From Swiss-Prot:
<feature type="disulfide bond">
    <location>
        <begin position="130"/>
        <end position="195"/>
    </location>
</feature>
<dbReference type="InterPro" id="IPR010044">
    <property type="entry name" value="MTAP"/>
</dbReference>
<feature type="binding site">
    <location>
        <begin position="50"/>
        <end position="51"/>
    </location>
    <ligand>
        <name>phosphate</name>
    </ligand>
</feature>
<comment type="subunit">
    <text>Homohexamer. Dimer of a homotrimer.</text>
</comment>
<comment type="pathway">
    <text>Amino-acid biosynthesis; L-methionine biosynthesis via salvage pathway; S-methyl-5-thio-alpha-D-ribose 1-phosphate from S-methyl-5'-thioadenosine (phosphorylase route): step 1/1.</text>
</comment>
<feature type="site" description="Important for substrate specificity">
    <location>
        <position position="163"/>
    </location>
</feature>
<comment type="similarity">
    <text>Belongs to the PNP/MTAP phosphorylase family. MTAP subfamily.</text>
</comment>
<comment type="function">
    <text>Catalyzes the reversible phosphorylation of S-methyl-5'-thioadenosine (MTA) to adenine and 5-methylthioribose-1-phosphate. Involved in the breakdown of MTA, a major by-product of polyamine biosynthesis. Responsible for the first step in the methionine salvage pathway after MTA has been generated from S-adenosylmethionine. Has broad substrate specificity with 6-aminopurine nucleosides as preferred substrates.</text>
</comment>
<feature type="binding site">
    <location>
        <position position="181"/>
    </location>
    <ligand>
        <name>phosphate</name>
    </ligand>
</feature>
<dbReference type="GO" id="GO:0019509">
    <property type="term" value="P:L-methionine salvage from methylthioadenosine"/>
</dbReference>
<dbReference type="GO" id="GO:0005829">
    <property type="term" value="C:cytosol"/>
</dbReference>
<keyword id="KW-0328">Glycosyltransferase</keyword>
<feature type="disulfide bond">
    <location>
        <begin position="246"/>
        <end position="248"/>
    </location>
</feature>
<keyword id="KW-1015">Disulfide bond</keyword>
<feature type="binding site">
    <location>
        <position position="10"/>
    </location>
    <ligand>
        <name>phosphate</name>
    </ligand>
</feature>
<protein>
    <recommendedName>
        <fullName>S-methyl-5'-thioadenosine phosphorylase</fullName>
        <ecNumber>2.4.2.28</ecNumber>
    </recommendedName>
</protein>
<dbReference type="InterPro" id="IPR018099">
    <property type="entry name" value="Purine_phosphorylase-2_CS"/>
</dbReference>
Amino acid sequence: MPKIGIIGGSGVYGIFEPKETVKVHTPYGRPSAPVEIGEIEGVEVAFIPRHGKYHEFPPHEVPYRANIWALHELGVERVIAVNAVGSLKEEYKPGDIVIIDQFIDFTKKREYTFYNGPRVAHISMADPFCPELRRIFIETAKELNLPVHEKGTYICIEGPRFSTRAESRMFRQFADVIGMTLVPEVNLARELGMCYVNISTVTDYDVWAEKPVDAQEVLRVMKENEEKVQKLLKRAIPKIPEERKCGCADVLKTMFV
């Protein structure tokens, strides 16, 4: 079974021809969609469309626990998450790729943990993303001459609404990009000892910029971002070593009370 899982949206559709589709039943309900299993450049991978096959789940209703649990149950050890984000900084331009290294959680009512009792866990999130996967994707993006930022702080809001201008200006003080789907996905992967890397693609500037958003321009950028992400995945995934040496699973040794 695959040891690499991808969670993403339309930008990842069609990257491989599924060899198998697996319906996984979890203690947390059904995942967003059946898990598709196929190969990318000879490497077996599993894929879950985060928002569902027909984009039926808004960000605050995505079954995050079921998605992560399903991948873990299939034997996945590494999760590659792809998100579209808005930019909070001038230098993070539409069309850029950001390999996120930190996040701020501004969500409000999601299921954040697998441990709601009777067992209690406190997971360290000081460095929430896998250093080994981050290095591979940064190096590969540079090899491909893609516009990549090696670091970025992602602020995750509840959604599905977008920010007010006042909120956007406040968020600019703390973060570089803004989105709605990183949390609790990253927390949950860490609780199961899985490696997790986030590839964020910038579609536009958030409303702080006070520039009119051109819908056609956003669609054009999104299409270009899809091509960049697929190119990046196809080049980077074969470089991921079979054995994990990152220490991501070590957090399990100290998380339980």
